[in-house]
């Protein structure tokens, strides 16, 4: 039911029209594995053959083929985070990267439709930066433990407790939280963001470990929140030291969402893109990536001769995004990502300040 504003001179709010109604629904294609599909996807299989056995490719290829055709038909672009599985990352994604890269690239997209292969806050960020575009996420239940650790109301209480202290919010948060924020950050630019502020004290939320790690690199006083990434908080310094002892010469590369004790053991720490660039530049013989499991597979497909040693931890939220769900998203124009207009402008400003920050 459309609610009318009966105040003098007020026009009724326009009725919402779903993406499915705007673009129409397309009938599901035949997903049989044919010789033609095998030929047309052969160059893509070359990228993932070390992770997907040939007999299993018959189940993947029809989806890959259908998605890549539908992208053109829909004038859509697929943005995929570095934690997506190799079949998505290498076979259907148009743009890949960490949260900062995806946020920046989202502002340069010409396509009418963005399909975000990642978790919900990433899709929200793309919508904030592209309010006129249609943004879809294949599974709206793809959440994030960090995003769920804090609300906009929590930030307002923090601002009351620490009046005048600027708030730097990790991009792994909802639009509601971003709207209460001075500027956003990612794991790749958090230090630059903190240093860009004139205040000697900064609220860096909600990732406690990220804040603790940046506090070691700045003279500013860092206040934080007790949010944690469920993937990275499970790693311990003791297990990494044990791996180092058992594997002499191995290089350990960690994500700054890990506890500072873990980062102390690492030979390098950085965002997911920072990790990728480190491996490409240094070409270490053996590497232990202290992050989500798909990272090693995605790097290994591009960098030959590097032996990636476990352990790793799976992100159950990232793994909710699959080829069948991406196909359904493009066929049915679901699930559309919307941001409450009451908070969108303020949330967008915090993200744009981050994107436009010169580093």
From Swiss-Prot:
Q: Which UniProt keywords apply?
A: 4Fe-4S, Cytoplasm, Iron, Iron-sulfur, Metal-binding, Pyridine nucleotide biosynthesis, Transferase
Q: Name the residues that bind iminosuccinate.
A: 81, 99, 170-172, 187, 255-257, 272
TM annotation in the entry:
none
| Any Gene Ontology CC annotation | cytosol
Q: Identify which top EC class this enzyme belongs to.
A: transferase
One molecular function GO term is: quinolinate synthetase A activity
> What domain of life does the native source organism fall in?
Bacteria
Name the pathway.
Cofactor biosynthesis; NAD(+) biosynthesis; quinolinate from iminoaspartate: step 1/1
| Pfam families associated with the record | NadA
Q: Which reaction does it catalyse?
A: iminosuccinate + dihydroxyacetone phosphate = quinolinate + phosphate + 2 H2O + H(+)
Q: What is its main location?
A: cytoplasm
Q: Which GO terms describe its biological process?
A: 'de novo' NAD biosynthetic process from L-aspartate
Query: Do you know which NCBIfam families this protein is assigned to?
Result: nadA, PRK09375.1-2, PRK09375.1-4
Query: What's this protein's family per the entry?
Result: Belongs to the quinolinate synthase family. Type 2 subfamily.
The identity of this protein, by name, is: Quinolinate synthase
What organism is the protein native to? Answer: Sinorhizobium fredii (strain NBRC 101917 / NGR234)
């Amino acid at each position: 039911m459309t609610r009318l504003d009966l105040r003098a001179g007020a026009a009724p709010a326009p009725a919402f029209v779903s993406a499915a109604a705007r673009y129409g629904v397309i009938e599901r294609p035949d997903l049989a594995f044919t010789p033609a599909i095998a030929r047309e996807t052969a160059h893509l299989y070359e990228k993932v053959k070390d992770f997907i056995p040939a007999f299993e490719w018959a189940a993947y290829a029809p989806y890959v083929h259908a998605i890549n055709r539908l992208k053109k038909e829909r004038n859509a672009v697929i943005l995929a985070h570095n934690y997506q599985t190799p079949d998505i990352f290498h076979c259907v994604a148009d743009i890949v990267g960490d949260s900062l890269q995806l946020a920046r690239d989202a502002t340069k997209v010409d396509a009418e439709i963005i399909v975000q292969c990642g978790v919900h806050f990433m899709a929200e960020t793309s919508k904030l930066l592209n309010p006129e575009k249609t943004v879809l996420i294949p599974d709206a239940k793809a959440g994030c433990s960090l995003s769920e650790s804090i609300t906009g109301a929590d930030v307002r209480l923090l601002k009351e407790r620490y009046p005048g202290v600027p708030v730097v919010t990790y991009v792994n948060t909802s639009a509601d939280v971003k709207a209460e924020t001075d500027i956003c950050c990612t794991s790749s630019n958090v230090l630059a963001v903190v240093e860009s502020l004139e205040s000697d004290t900064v609220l860096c939320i909600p990732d406690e470990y990220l804040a603790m790690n940046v506090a070691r690199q700045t003279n500013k006083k860092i206040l934080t929140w007790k949010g944690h990434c469920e993937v990275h908080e499970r790693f311990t310094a003791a297990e990494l030291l044990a791996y180092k002892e058992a594997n002499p010469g191995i290089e350990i590369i960690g994500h700054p969402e890990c506890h500072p004790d873990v980062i102390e053991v690492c030979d390098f720490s950085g965002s997911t893109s920072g990790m990728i660039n480190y491996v490409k530049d240094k070409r270490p013989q053996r590497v232990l990536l202290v992050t989500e499991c798909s990272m090693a597979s995605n790097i290994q497909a591009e960098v030959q001769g590097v032996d990636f040693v476990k352990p790793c931890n799976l992100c159950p939220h990232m793994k909710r995004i699959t080829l069948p769900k991406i196909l359904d998203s493009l066929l049915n124009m679901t699930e559309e990502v919307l941001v409450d207009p009451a908070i969108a402008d303020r949330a967008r400003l915090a993200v744009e300040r981050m994107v436009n920050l010169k580093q």
